[in-house]
């Protein structure tokens, strides 16, 4: 017969765990909202930067512009910037992006190219260090909601690698935020920069809302407002120098957006994982309660049988 006290203790333990997972789900939801607000807040700056870059690019389209950050050279070595999380309890978020980066490294090796990692997040750092992979720099303990200062710091390292010609191309491996239950590890080239297509680039802004007591994400496509600068605009500096100065800022802005997307993906994965854990805890509590009631009923029945048996023995 199951021990009633052990079942009761287990029910209480599962209830306490459910409180923790539910609290973690709500905290993750609050942070997703903060990430959403940050994306919206940085959008005007990103729009204006794209407009100026497109304007300068249009103004200089007939000139022979030789800028280091735009120059494509023969690729012999590739830097892989991998963005993961510092913590677990977020489903397959870390595993998926690490696997994508590892597969890309194998592809580069098969092509006869050297590679090195720049890591963001403790999980990816631990994984690749255990496998003795080349790591040029790592960044851990970043804010839950990425900041521009953090993006600038990482961008400086990437610029140093590229301009010193230690690597000829830098690729970014991060998790693109799709929805609360879906995210996708993707790869894009960061350096050399490609400013083509700025005038037609669309972007998406996500909003976390509630409907019927459930969290959901609404996505809004925003069309870029980039357009040529006025023909009569006079520059105090050489337009080439201005473009050269703005390109690192453009890189930092791209990197900040990738950090924001990755953070939102991690938080959404944690929300989903904790929601599933809470549901499983609820089901386990029901099952344990049923077992407890059956065991209690069996114990009462046994006691009654013993009482009846004792009474019959006395008569």
Curated annotation (Swiss-Prot):
It is found in: Cellular thylakoid membrane. GO terms for molecular function: ATP binding; proton-transporting ATP synthase activity, rotational mechanism. InterPro entries: ATP_synth_F1_ATPase_gsu, ATP_synth_F1_gsu, ATP_synth_F1_gsu_CS. It is a peripheral membrane protein. Its main location: membrane. The keyword Transport applies. Transmembrane segments: none annotated. GO terms for cellular component: plasma membrane-derived thylakoid membrane; proton-transporting ATP synthase complex. The keyword Kinase does not apply. Keywords: ATP synthesis, CF(1), Hydrogen ion transport, Ion transport, Membrane, Thylakoid, Transport. PANTHER family: ATP SYNTHASE GAMMA CHAIN, ATP SYNTHASE GAMMA CHAIN, CHLOROPLASTIC. Produces ATP from ADP in the presence of a proton gradient across the membrane. The gamma chain is believed to be important in regulating ATPase activity and the flow of protons through the CF(0) complex. F-type ATPases have 2 components, CF(1) - the catalytic core - and CF(0) - the membrane proton channel. CF(1) has five subunits: alpha(3), beta(3), gamma(1), delta(1), epsilon(1). CF(0) has three main subunits: a, b and c. Belongs to the ATPase gamma chain family. This is ATP synthase gamma chain. It comes from Nostoc sp. (strain PCC 7120 / SAG 25.82 / UTEX 2576).
């Amino acid at each position: 017969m199951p021990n009633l006290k052990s079942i009761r203790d287990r029910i209480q333990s599962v209830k306490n765990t459910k409180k923790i997972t539910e609290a973690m789900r709500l905290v993750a939801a609050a942070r997703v909202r903060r990430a959403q607000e940050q994306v919206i807040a940085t959008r005007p700056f990103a729009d204006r930067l794209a407009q100026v870059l497109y304007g300068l690019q249009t103004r200089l389209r007939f000139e022979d512009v030789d800028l280091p950050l735009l120059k494509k050279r023969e690729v012999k070595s590739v830097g892989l910037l991998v963005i993961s999380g510092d913590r677990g309890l977020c489903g397959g978020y870390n595993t998926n992006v690490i696997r994508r980066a590892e597969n890309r490294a194998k592809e580069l090796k098969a092509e006869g190219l050297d590679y090195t990692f720049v890591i963001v997040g403790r999980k990816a750092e631990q994984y690749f260090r255990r496998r003795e992979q080349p790591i040029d720099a790592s960044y851990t303990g970043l804010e839950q909601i990425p900041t521009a200062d953090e993006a600038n710091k990482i961008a400086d390292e990437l610029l140093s690698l590229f301009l010193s010609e230690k690597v000829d191309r830098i690729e970014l491996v991060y998790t693109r935020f799709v929805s609360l239950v879906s995210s996708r590890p993707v790869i894009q080239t960061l350096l050399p920069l490609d400013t083509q297509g700025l005038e037609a680039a669309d972007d998406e802004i996500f909003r976390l809302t509630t409907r019927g007591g459930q969290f959901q994400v609404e996505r809004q496509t925003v069309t870029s407002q980039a357009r040529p600068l006025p023909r009569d605009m006079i520059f105090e500096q050489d337009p080439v120098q201005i473009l050269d100065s703005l390109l690192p800022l453009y890189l930092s802005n791209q990197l900040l957006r990738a950090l924001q997307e990755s953070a939102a993906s991690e938080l959404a994965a944690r929300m989903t994982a904790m929601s599933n854990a809470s549901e499983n805890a609820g089901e386990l509590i029901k099952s344990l309660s049923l077992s407890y009631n059956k065991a209690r009923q069996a114990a009462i029945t046994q006691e009654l049988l013993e009482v009846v048996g004792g009474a019959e023995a006395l008569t």
